[in-house]
Amino acid sequence: MLDISIAIDGPAGAGKSTIAKIIGNKLNIMYINTGSMYRAVTLMALKNNIEPYDIESLKALINSMNISFNGNNIIVNGKDLEEDIRMPIINNNVSKYAAVEEVRELLVSMQQNISKKYNVVMDGRDIGTVVLKDAPYKFFITASAEVRAKRRLKELKEKGININFRDVLKEIKERDYIDSNRKVNPLKQSKDAILIDTSNFTIEEVVDKICNIIKKD
């Protein structure tokens, strides 16, 4: 399969990362979780006591980060950060750092450079509208806030993180608001993206639906 790029956008907890990951494996193309990149920046910023408003320090931090992927795991400066970036403290702060214009500009540039070198499936908040505007395949994956909160709660409990449903739902709704209302590249469905509500479908059913659309071409 030559010269293919697939953009998958949607709110937190909709299942887009899991879906994109499986599609990448099925089609044998590179999967890039752009959310992991923002999470990694958030992790490193918190470790270095850099606030979201400290633009110059954030830019210097990002420029010092050598970001790559090993399978589905994000590697920064040679260290696997996949587990660290899934901690609740990152969930609670990532939208603040992701809303910073200069952060988005630097990471979008990295993402676009990757897409020029490889066939990719990327998931995030602004893939179809900004990062891969010309992607031939665009999908917007969503689900109700309650369904997404249940999924996130299950995921966190499986990792041994003890948290209640009400707190997870609150976090999901707060992230939705921040992601949809930020000034720079807000979460929104691209006009040419296919909308898929996953509330009543399994991951496998959604993957099959997307793969069938791609294979028809």
UniProtKB/Swiss-Prot annotation:
GO BP term (any one): nucleobase-containing small molecule interconversion
Classification via InterPro entries: Cytidylate_kin, Cytidylate_kinase_dom, P-loop_NTPase
Subcellular location: Cytoplasm
Binding, ATP: G10, P11, A12, G13, A14, G15, K16, S17, T18
Keywords linked to the UniProt accession: ATP-binding, Cytoplasm, Kinase, Nucleotide-binding, Transferase
Molecular function in Gene Ontology: ATP binding; CMP kinase activity; dCMP kinase activity
Record SUPFAM superfamilies: P-loop containing nucleoside triphosphate hydrolases
PANTHER family in UniProt: CYTIDYLATE KINASE, CYTIDYLATE KINASE/PANTOATE-BETA-ALANINE LIGASE
EC number: 2.7.4.25
Family designation: Belongs to the cytidylate kinase family. Type 1 subfamily.
Provenance organism: Clostridium botulinum (strain Okra / Type B1)
Keyword Chaperone attributed: no
GO cellular component: cytosol
Bilayer-crossing regions: none
Catalytic activity entry: CMP + ATP = CDP + ADP; dCMP + ATP = dCDP + ADP
Pfam families named among the record's database cross-references: Cytidylate_kin
Protein name as catalogued: Cytidylate kinase
